[in-house]
Regions:
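A short helix-loop-beta-strand connector motif used in the catalytic cores of GNAT acetyltransferases and
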Residues: 67-70, 81-96
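Acyl-donor (CoA/ACP) binding surface of acyl/acetyltransferases
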Residues: 2-47, 51-61, 96-214
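Generic, well-ordered alpha-helical segments
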Residues: 40, 51, 68-76, 89
Length: 214
């Protein structure tokens, strides 16, 4: 992900790709604070379970309500398997923010995920992320998002990324704006979050003038 930018010609060629026969490689990326941004693995299930349990109160205001199985080892294993199937199909990229080599940090510091990767004339994906409540405000989300933006542009050949936030989630809005995203509207009752339908601000980042597949 830290590779140099592709030439405009190469980006146009990527934009004409159909659904890929195999997923684009996802190299590890060392973030400035010491965390490692990498593709999720099946053996991450215990650490992800611990992370979600540890951050239950932190994430509750910004996430949909989860079933009881979500906070079980089996539930996390099933979720990872589903994410990797989506990655293999070219429809998603699920990263974890690995804190194994950060002094005093837990094994999982958060996640960042591309979902809904669409090619053809749209060439777009949605991005979502969260960071451990004890490690917010340290630039980790912004560092991870910068790596993800470069990957979307240079490896996936996408034209656009989109994201949404609750109206009062100013911290996430700042992360998006610093990464170059722009606000383009507010969607009423956009997602069912914390037990109710919630309005969301919508943001997008145009990655380049990519020519879609004919």
């Amino acid at each position: 992900m830290a590779a140099g930018r592709l030439s405009p010609t190469r980006r146009r060629t990527l934009g004409r790709m159909t659904e890929p026969d195999s997923p684009a490689p996802v190299p590890d990326a060392q973030l400035p604070g010491g965390a490692l941004m990498r593709l999720v693995r099946p053996d991450d299930a215990p650490a992800l379970l611990a992370a979600y349990r540890r951050n239950a109160a932190h994430l509750a205001p910004t996430e949909p309500r989860r079933g009881e199985r979500f906070l079980t080892l089996e539930g996390q294993a099933e979720r990872i398997a589903g994410q990797l199937r989506e990655w293999e199909a070219g429809r998603a990229v699920p990263w974890v923010l690995d804190g194994s080599h950060v002094p005093g940090a837990p094994p999982v510091l958060g996640t960042l995920t591309f979902t809904g990767i669409v090619r053809g004339p749209l060439l777009s994906a949605s991005v979502g992320y969260w960071v451990d409540g004890e490690h917010t405000g340290r630039g980790l989300a912004g560092q991870a998002l910068a790596q993800a933006v470069a990957y979307a542009r240079d490896a996936l050949g996408l034209h656009r990324l989109e994201a949404g936030t609750l109206l009062d989630n100013t911290a996430s809005q700042r992360v998006l704006l610093r990464a170059g995203f722009t606000w383009y509207g507010t969607a009423p009752d956009y997602l069912h979050i914390a037990g109710a339908w919630r309005d969301h601000h919508r943001y997008q980042l145009i990655l380049g003038e990519v020519e879609p597949r004919p």
